[in-house]
Amino acid sequence: MTKLHFDTAEPVKITLPNGLTYEQPTGLFINNKFMKAQDGKTYPVEDPSTENTVCEVSSATTEDVEYAIECADRAFHDTEWATQDPRERGRLLSKLADELESQIDLVSSIEALDNGKTLALARGDVTIAINCLRDAAAYADKVNGRTINTGDGYMNFTTLEPIGVCGQIIPWNFPIMMLAWKIAPALAMGNVCILKPAAVTPLNALYFASLCKKVGIPAGVVNIVPGPGRTVGAALTNDPRIRKLAFTGSTEVGKSVAVDSSESNLKKITLELGGKSAHLVFDDANIKKTLPNLVNGIFKNAGQICSSGSRIYVQEGIYDELLAAFKAYLETEIKVGNPFDKANFQGAITNRQQFDTIMNYIDIGKKEGAKILTGGEKVGDKGYFIRPTVFYDVNEDMRIVKEEIFGPVVTVAKFKTLEEGVEMANSSEFGLGSGIETESLSTGLKVAKMLKAGTVWINTYNDFDSRVPFGGVKQSGYGREMGEEVYHAYTEVKAVRIKL
């Protein structure tokens, strides 16, 4: 093993805006220890609702990541983790789910502080994370191979075997939920993990690591290494000891991840990338029921969801009526502000860079000639808050229609026929999510079959369940998170053929 010397990183006591206090780990979590980075460097973590520094956490170096990979590799090859009765892994995952659930108030509050989303939304994210762990616990001993009858004097069967060391890179929009999406199935199938949280939202990943140790996850099985993508991410994608890599983030970075993973050792990879999803509203839609779905589709999590329904297409028969109702609903029902205030639907944008990007796109939309129905401005003097923004009378050549904004900004256009609406929806190079609003089940199912997207929501939107697979087509990536499908992504198939 590499001869490196690490100092213990001490936790810091944090008092959250709702009065809860806790000990926040600040070090790299490697081999069940919280350590300072090899070079001792740290970086500040910001509360996006106030722009104040919460604490400093260690920033991993390439040497730190290599050490984490060595520890994970040892845990996989030199311990019984991968070969033990899978029910034992299920038992530990169940304990981890119980521990997370027992601390749901605290973990939700950490998420709201670190990410800027509302406390209610954060609690929903933690609930999904808990469900992912429970699903993984149940699946641990139930994802198996099969026998194959060839009728020729042979016995044939397959086994599903763990891949090995898995690199996992998650974004800042759903820190705890994305962590569970990736770690839970990997562990259930007998793999070991090195997870890189987004640099701007590392707090819950590090706190989760402390829970892993508490419930008895063996050393080296889970490692958390915060730091910049150019250092930590590059080390994971380029190291040949990483056999599987799961990445959620932008399409641009995802393409680089695919190239590096291929050139290093043809890693098995899952990519969940960007989106510019369409939300179709047909003439027969119930407008009262549709409005909350449109809001959840684009303004949930301040629009920072890769599957956000950021292009709304409304059939011409109800276009004017829906625009008026949408404007009234947003201006009277949707409040923006302090994530810990229960009255607010939308919290802060997670970081300054993304805030500036969104405001720039709003300026671009104005210059392109799109009309603003409502919103378009910053909220308050402190924190990264943007009012929900709706552009209408847009055309398909506008940048605000074609490019992912990743914020509370939506475009609205009209269509005449079902076929025209589907054509407009499918015109994007992305294909992550899509939505349909209609009172006709036959219309919904017909259009769902025609849409080029990994997920189609009918009369709902951005409505996730850990038992349902999620992923994209086209430039939104490949592979699936959640559902039974994700467990197969963390195994290799071995065929055995015996001559009788």
Swiss-Prot record:
<dbReference type="InterPro" id="IPR015590">
    <property type="entry name" value="Aldehyde_DH_dom"/>
</dbReference>
<dbReference type="InterPro" id="IPR029510">
    <property type="entry name" value="Ald_DH_CS_GLU"/>
</dbReference>
<dbReference type="GO" id="GO:0006740">
    <property type="term" value="P:NADPH regeneration"/>
</dbReference>
<keyword id="KW-0521">NADP</keyword>
<dbReference type="GO" id="GO:0005829">
    <property type="term" value="C:cytosol"/>
</dbReference>
<feature type="cross-link" description="Glycyl lysine isopeptide (Lys-Gly) (interchain with G-Cter in ubiquitin)">
    <location>
        <position position="142"/>
    </location>
</feature>
<feature type="site" description="Transition state stabilizer">
    <location>
        <position position="173"/>
    </location>
</feature>
<feature type="cross-link" description="Glycyl lysine isopeptide (Lys-Gly) (interchain with G-Cter in ubiquitin)">
    <location>
        <position position="3"/>
    </location>
</feature>
<feature type="active site" description="Nucleophile">
    <location>
        <position position="306"/>
    </location>
</feature>
<dbReference type="GO" id="GO:0004030">
    <property type="term" value="F:aldehyde dehydrogenase [NAD(P)+] activity"/>
</dbReference>
<feature type="active site" description="Proton acceptor">
    <location>
        <position position="272"/>
    </location>
</feature>
<keyword id="KW-0460">Magnesium</keyword>
<dbReference type="InterPro" id="IPR016161">
    <property type="entry name" value="Ald_DH/histidinol_DH"/>
</dbReference>
<comment type="pathway">
    <text>Alcohol metabolism; ethanol degradation; acetate from ethanol: step 2/2.</text>
</comment>
<keyword id="KW-1017">Isopeptide bond</keyword>
<dbReference type="GO" id="GO:0006068">
    <property type="term" value="P:ethanol catabolic process"/>
</dbReference>
<dbReference type="GO" id="GO:0005739">
    <property type="term" value="C:mitochondrion"/>
</dbReference>
<comment type="function">
    <text>Cytosolic aldehyde dehydrogenase which utilizes NADP(+) as the preferred coenzyme. Performs the conversion of acetaldehyde to acetate.</text>
</comment>
<keyword id="KW-0560">Oxidoreductase</keyword>
<dbReference type="GO" id="GO:0140088">
    <property type="term" value="F:acetaldehyde dehydrogenase (NADP+) activity"/>
</dbReference>
<dbReference type="InterPro" id="IPR016162">
    <property type="entry name" value="Ald_DH_N"/>
</dbReference>
<dbReference type="GO" id="GO:0004029">
    <property type="term" value="F:aldehyde dehydrogenase (NAD+) activity"/>
</dbReference>
<feature type="binding site">
    <location>
        <begin position="249"/>
        <end position="254"/>
    </location>
    <ligand>
        <name>NAD(+)</name>
    </ligand>
</feature>
<dbReference type="GO" id="GO:0009651">
    <property type="term" value="P:response to salt stress"/>
</dbReference>
<keyword id="KW-0963">Cytoplasm</keyword>
<dbReference type="GO" id="GO:0019413">
    <property type="term" value="P:acetate biosynthetic process"/>
</dbReference>
<protein>
    <recommendedName>
        <fullName>Magnesium-activated aldehyde dehydrogenase, cytosolic</fullName>
        <ecNumber>1.2.1.-</ecNumber>
        <ecNumber>1.2.1.4</ecNumber>
    </recommendedName>
</protein>
<keyword id="KW-0832">Ubl conjugation</keyword>
<dbReference type="InterPro" id="IPR016163">
    <property type="entry name" value="Ald_DH_C"/>
</dbReference>
<dbReference type="Pfam" id="PF00171">
    <property type="entry name" value="Aldedh"/>
</dbReference>
<comment type="similarity">
    <text>Belongs to the aldehyde dehydrogenase family.</text>
</comment>
<feature type="cross-link" description="Glycyl lysine isopeptide (Lys-Gly) (interchain with G-Cter in ubiquitin)">
    <location>
        <position position="196"/>
    </location>
</feature>
